[in-house]
């Protein structure tokens, strides 16, 4: 009996995959915020210590463009990785976002990440 128990234990130890350590992903976007208006970019009139800490330990974009002059189409472009003119009504201020377009949060969730948001997930406006 003890041998069977030990064999079962060895089998379980061998077949169990170690949990893969996946990186945390934090994506933050703000509407209608001009490029230099955060202290991480050197703005002296606006104090943004939370963003500064994230920028120091993560990624700070210094050369990026908006996919569209409107906020909802820009968010839709960022979320899908497509130009706003390629995603039908999601590329406008219309209130529909067709489910046929996958977003990177959808893909992260399917990969086992916990995904959440506050504020606007997409739009409109």
Show the residue positions of the predicted features:
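Formylglycine-dependent sulfatase
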Residues: 2-5, 16-125
């Amino acid at each position: 009996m003890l041998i069977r128990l030990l064999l079962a234990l060895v089998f379980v130890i061998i077949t169990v995959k170690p949990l893969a350590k996946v990186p945390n992903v934090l994506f933050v976007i703000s509407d209608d915020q001009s490029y230099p208006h955060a202290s991480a970019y050197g703005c002296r009139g606006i104090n943004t210590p939370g963003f500064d800490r994230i920028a120091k330990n993560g990624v700070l974009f210094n050369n990026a463009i908006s996919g569209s002059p409107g906020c909802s189409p820009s968010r839709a472009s960022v979320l899908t990785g497509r130009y706003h003119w390629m995603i039908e009504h999601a590329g406008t201020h219309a209130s529909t976002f067709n489910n046929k377009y996958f977003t990177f949060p959808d893909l992260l969730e399917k990969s086992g990440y916990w995904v959440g948001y506050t504020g606007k997930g997409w739009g409109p406006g």
